[in-house]
C-alpha cells in the first residue's frame, strides 16, 4: 500500500490491515443450537430506532446482528485467545485489532486522496417476505447507505465533511475520495455507530419498522417488544466462519439471541442468579459479592466504565454557570475522593474522563496535569465558598438538574452530590426522567441548567469533539469556543499519531481546566456469565457499541447447562 498509507504510518485510518482469520485458541469443539439470553450493557434501555438515518447512538447495538459493516473487530486478538485486546471499549478499535467484514481488502491511493475497497463476493441479503427477494450484496449498497446517512436531516454536524464522494467503480469495488487526511475515516463509516449496510429495499419498505429489517449478518430480527425484548434468529445462509484449532465452523452457533430489557436492577440481577439470563454484561459493584456467594459458578470480567459521569452546567444561557469561578467552585465542593472510597468502596477511578486510561498516549494521568486541573479533584469547600463569593454568590444559589431514572447508579449518586453542594449554599432540585424524555431534552436543547449524565468516551478524538465542539448533539453544557473548535479540527487532520496524541492531551487539559462539568469518578463495572457460555471471555464490543460478531461466535453447552440444574 502506498500514498496515504505511507503518510499515515501508525495512524488509525492508515493502519487498517488486510483481513485476518478469526482463530479461537480452544480445543473444545463447538456445539450448535439453543438460545442465548442476554442482559446487555444497556439492559434497562429498549431499542430507540431501527433506522440508521435517525443517527441514534444505540442503533448499532440493536441492528449489528443483521446489518454488517465494512470493518469490524478482529476477535482473534481477544485476550482469551492469547491476544492483547479486551474488546470492551465502546467505540475504539486499535489499528492492530481491525479486520475486514464486508470488505475483503483495501488500498490507499493519492491524487486524488482515496481508498479503494474490494468487497467480498457472494454475500447475500436473504429473502424477506414483503420487502425483498434474496440477492447479492454489492458496491451500490455501500454507496446507497452512505449517501442516505449523509443526506439525513438528523446527521451529526460535520460528520462526513471530510469525504468528497463515494462511488461504486464496479460491482464489488467502492471508492471513498477524501478532501484531506482524517484520523477517524474508518470509524465514521467503516465500523461506526451508523455504519451498517442497509439495502434500498428496506428503506423503500420503511426502515424504521423493525418488521422490514434484513441484512447480511449472522442473525435476523424476528421479534421486538418495546420495553421487553429483541429476538434475533440464526441466518442459515450466513457467509462467515470461525476457525477453532485446525477446523473452520460455520457461524452462528446458537439458533437464537434474545436481548432482555429489564428496567429494575434487582430483577435483572435475580435473572442472572437463577439462570434466566446466560450473560449479564453490566453489574454494579454493589451486587458482585452477593452474586459470587449465591452463584459461585459464574465467570467474571471487571472493566472500567466506558463513559464518564458528570453534572453538566449549561454555559449557553444566562446564569451563574457563565462564570468559570462558579464552575470551579462546584467542583471543589464535591469530595470526589470520598465518593471513590465510601460510595464506590474503591471500585472507581478518581480521574478517567474525558480521556480513558485505556487510550494509551492520549491519556494523561491526574498527577501529570497542571495544578489548576488537579485542584478541581481535591475537596476544598472553603475555597469553593470564596470563589462563589467572588463571583457574586456569597449565599449560593439553586438550580434544577435532570437525571435519567434508567441509571440506578445516578439515582443514588446525584443526591450525594447535592448534599456536598448544599454545604456551600448551592441547592439542587432533582428531576428524574425516563430515558426517552431525558435524551430528548438534550437533543432539543430544552434541558435544565444542570444535566446529570454519563457520556461514552467513544474514542480519543470523538470524546472531545462530541462533548465540547460548538453545535454538537452530545454537548450538554453548550460549550462553544471557536479557537477550541479550530484546534480540534487540526487534530483530526494531523496524520502523525504521536503529534495527534500531544494535541489531544492539550485539548483535554484545557477543557478540564475550564470545567463545564462537575467531573466525577468513573466506576468499575462487572460482567458475568454462566460456564455453559462457551467461546467467550467478557468481550462487549466488536465495533461501535456493536456486539453482534461476538454473539455469533458463542455457543451454549446445553448438556452442561442441564447438568448444572438449569
Which positions does each model-derived feature cover?
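Surface-exposed binding/hinge segments that line
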Residues: 31, 107, 111, 116-121, ...
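N-terminal lobe/hinge region of extracytoplasmic solute-binding protein
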Residues: 37-110, 214
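Detector for C-terminal structural segments
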Residues: 40, 44-46, 55-65, 225-230, ...
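Aromatic- and charge-enriched surface segment that lines or borders ligand/interaction sites
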Residues: 97, 102-153, 259, 268-271, ...
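Alpha-helical secondary-structure segments
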Residues: 37-40, 134, 138-143, 171-175, ...
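Ligand-site clamp/hinge motif
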Residues: 135, 204-210, 238-290, 306, ...
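Extracellular/periplasmic solute-recognition and catalytic clefts
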Residues: 165-166, 222-233, 260-318, 337, ...
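Gly/Pro-rich hinge or "lid" segments in bacterial periplasmic/extracellular proteins
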Residues: 74-79, 85-93, 97, 187-258, ...
Amino acid at each position: 500500500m502506498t500514498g496515504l498509507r505511507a503518510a499515515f504510518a501508525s495512524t488509525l485510518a492508515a493502519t487498517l490491515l488486510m483481513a485476518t482469520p478469526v482463530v479461537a485458541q480452544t480445543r473444545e469443539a463447538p456445539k450448535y443450537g439453543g438460545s442465548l439470553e442476554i442482559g446487555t450493557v444497556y439492559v434497562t434501555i429498549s431499542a430507540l430506532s431501527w433506522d440508521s438515518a435517525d443517527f441514534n447512538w444505540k442503533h448499532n447495538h440493536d441492528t449489528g446482528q443483521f446489518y454488517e459493516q465494512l470493518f469490524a473487530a478482529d476477535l482473534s486478538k481477544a485476550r482469551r485467545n492469547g491476544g492483547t485486546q479486551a474488546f470492551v471499549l465502546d467505540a475504539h478499535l486499535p489499528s492492530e485489532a481491525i479486520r475486514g467484514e464486508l470488505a475483503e481488502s483495501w488500498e490507499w491511493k493519492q491524487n486524488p486522496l482515496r481508498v479503494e475497497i474490494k468487497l467480498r463476493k457472494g454475500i447475500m441479503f436473504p429473502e424477506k417476505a414483503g420487502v425483498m427477494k434474496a440477492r447479492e450484496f454489492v458496491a451500490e449498497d455501500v454507496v446507497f447507505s452512505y449517501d442516505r446517512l449523509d443526506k439525513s436531516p438528523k446527521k451529526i454536524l460535520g460528520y462526513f465533511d471530510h469525504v468528497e464522494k463515494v462511488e461504486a467503480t464496479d460491482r464489488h469495488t467502492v471508492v471513498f475520495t477524501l478532501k484531506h487526511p482524517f484520523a477517524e475515516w474508518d470509524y465514521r463509516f467503516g465500523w461506526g455507530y451508523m455504519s451498517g449496510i442497509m439495502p434500498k429495499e428496506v428503506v423503500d419498505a420503511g426502515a424504521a419498522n423493525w418488521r422490514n429489517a434484513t441484512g447480511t449478518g449472522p442473525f435476523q430480527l424476528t421479534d421486538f417488544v418495546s420495553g421487553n425484548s429483541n429476538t434475533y434468529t440464526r441466518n442459515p445462509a450466513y457467509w462467515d466462519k470461525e476457525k477453532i484449532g485446525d477446523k473452520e465452523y460455520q457461524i452462528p452457533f446458537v439458533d437464537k439471541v434474545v436481548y432482555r430489557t429489564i428496567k429494575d436492577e434487582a430483577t435483572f440481577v435475580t435473572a442472572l442468579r437463577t439462570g434466566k439470563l446466560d450473560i449479564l454484561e453490566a453489574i454494579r459493584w454493589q451486587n458482585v459479592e452477593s452474586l459470587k456467594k449465591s452463584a459461585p459458578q459464574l465467570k467474571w470480567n471487571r472493566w472500567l466504565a466506558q463513559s464518564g459521569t458528570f453534572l453538566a452546567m449549561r454555559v449557553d444561557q444566562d446564569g451563574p454557570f457563565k462564570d468559570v469561578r462558579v464552575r470551579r467552585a462546584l467542583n471543589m465542593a464535591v469530595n470526589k475522593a470520598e465518593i471513590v472510597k465510601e460510595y464506590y468502596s474503591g471500585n472507581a477511578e478518581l480521574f478517567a474522563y474525558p480521556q480513558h486510561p485505556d487510550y494509551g498516549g492520549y491519556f494523561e494521568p491526574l498527577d501529570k496535569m497542571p495544578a489548576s486541573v488537579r485542584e478541581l479533584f481535591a475537596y476544598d469547600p472553603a475555597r469553593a465558598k470564596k470563589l462563589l463569593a467572588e463571583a457574586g454568590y456569597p449565599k449560593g444559589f439553586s438550580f434544577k438538574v435532570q437525571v435519567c431514572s434508567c441509571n440506578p447508579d445516578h439515582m443514588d449518586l446525584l443526591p450525594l452530590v447535592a448534599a456536598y453542594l448544599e454545604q456551600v449554599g448551592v441547592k439542587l432540585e432533582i428531576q428524574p426522567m425516563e430515558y426517552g424524555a431525558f435524551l430528548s431534552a438534550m437533543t432539543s436543547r430544552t434541558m435544565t441548567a444542570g444535566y446529570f449524565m454519563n457520556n461514552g468516551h467513544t474514542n480519543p478524538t470523538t470524546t472531545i469533539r462530541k462533548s465540547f465542539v460548538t453545535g454538537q448533539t452530545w454537548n450538554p453544557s453548550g460549550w462553544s469556543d471557536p479557537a477550541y473548535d479550530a484546534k480540534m479540527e487540526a487534530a483530526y487532520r494531523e496524520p502523525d499519531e504521536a503529534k495527534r496524541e500531544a494535541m489531544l492531551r492539550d485539548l483535554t487539559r484545557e477543557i478540564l481546566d475550564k470545567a463545564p462539568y462537575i467531573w466525577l469518578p468513573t466506576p468499575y463495572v462487572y460482567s458475568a456469565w454462566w460456564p455453559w457460555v462457551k467461546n467467550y471471555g467478557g468481550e462487549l464490543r466488536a465495533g461501535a457499541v456493536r456486539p453482534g460478531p461476538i454473539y455469533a461466535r458463542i455457543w451454549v453447552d446445553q448438556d452442561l447447562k442441564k447438568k448444572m440444574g438449569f
